[in-house]
Amino acid sequence: MVEGESKALWIILATVFAVAAVAPAVHGQQTPCYFVFGDSVFDNGNNNALNTKAKVNYLPYGIDYFQGPTGRFSNGRNIPDVIAELAGFNNPIPPFAGASQAQANIGLNYASGAGGIREETSENMGERISLRQQVNNHFSAIITAAVPLSRLRQCLYTINIGSNDYLNNYFLSPPTLARRLFNPDQYARSLISLYRIYLTQLYVLGARNVALFGIGKIGCTPRIVATLGGGTGCAEEVNQAVIIFNTKLKALVTDFNNKPGAMFTYVDLFSGNAEDFAALGITVGDRSCCTVNPGEELCAANGPVCPDRNKFIFWDNVHTTEVINTVVANAAFNGPIASPFNISQLVN
C-alpha cells in the first residue's frame, strides 16, 4: 500500500473510532457464539497456569481492567474484549482454561501468549499453546458440550497468529533451523500451508464467519527496534518478511471464500503508521508505557507506569495499550481495515 493510501485508511479509521466512541451501545447479542484463537494479542488468561515466561497475571498488567490482572497482555481490554462488546455480548469471552463445559455454547477464548503456527515457535519461552493445540481444544470443547453444527455455523471466529513465528522463531538469534532452511518467501509459504490445514479443520467443525488478523508492523515494536533495528528505527528486514506473509494470508482468505457458506475476511494491522494515530491524541510510539527491564519485553512486576496511557501505542515492548486495542477493534468491526467484509457483516 502506498503512503497516501495508508494515510487515507487511518484517517478513516480515526473517524470510525470517533463515531463509535459516541454511538449508542449495541442492544442484543448479534451472534450466538464467539470463538477466539491466537497469541498474546488475544490471550486473556490461558497461560496463567503454564510454566512459561509468556504470562502476565500480575500488576501493572490489567491496571485499567475491571478485574485487574487476568492474563491480558495490556493495561486494559484486548481486541476480542471490544469485539465482544460491539457484537452485543454482556460479558467478555472467557479463557478456555477453567471454563465450564456449557460455555462452549456461547464462546471460548483459546489464545495463548507465545503461541504460533509452527509447533517449535517460542520454545525459548517455555510452555505455550500452538494453533494446532488450540484447534484441538476447540474440537474437544464443542464435542463435549454437544454444540450443534447449525449453531457453530452462525458463530463468529477471530484469529490473530503468526507474529511469534517471526519474533520467537525466524528472527531469533542465533539463527533457528527455520531461518537456515527457508528464505522469507519459503518460510511464509510454510506458515500458510500449516494455517490452511488448521482453518480447514475449523471449517469442517462449522466455522463460516471468520476474521483473520494479519501481522502488524512488528519490525517497529520497541523490542525489535532495540535489537534488530539498531536502536534507531524500524527493522525493515522484519517488516518486509511480514509483508510477504500478509500477502499470502489475503490469498488464503480468497481461497476459503470459494467454499460453500464461507465468509472469511482479512484484517489489516500493517498499513497504519505511528504518526497516523496523532489525530486521536496517541502520540508516543517509540517506547513502552510500563517499565521494562533491559533485555526484556514484558512489564516489570509492580513497576512504574506512565500516567497518560491513552497517549501511548505500546504498553510493553511488544503489546499495545487498551486505547489502541479499542481503535483496532472498532476499525475491524465497522470497517475500514477488514476486507472483503467487516466483522459487523460477519455477525449479521
UniProtKB/Swiss-Prot annotation:
Keyword Acetylation: no
Principal location class: secreted
Keywords annotated in UniProt: Glycoprotein, Hydrolase, Lipid degradation, Lipid metabolism, Secreted, Signal
Glycosylation site residues: N342
Range of residues in the leader sequence: 1-28
Catalytic residues (UniProt): S40 (nucleophile), D316, H319
Alphabetized Pfam families for the sequence: Lipase_GDSL
GO cellular component, one term: plasma membrane
Its EC number(s): 3.1.1.-
Subcellular location: Secreted
Gene Ontology BP, a term: lipid catabolic process
The keyword Glycoprotein is annotated on this UniProt entry: yes
UniProt record similarity statement: Belongs to the 'GDSL' lipolytic enzyme family.
Protein name as it appears in the record: GDSL esterase/lipase At4g30140
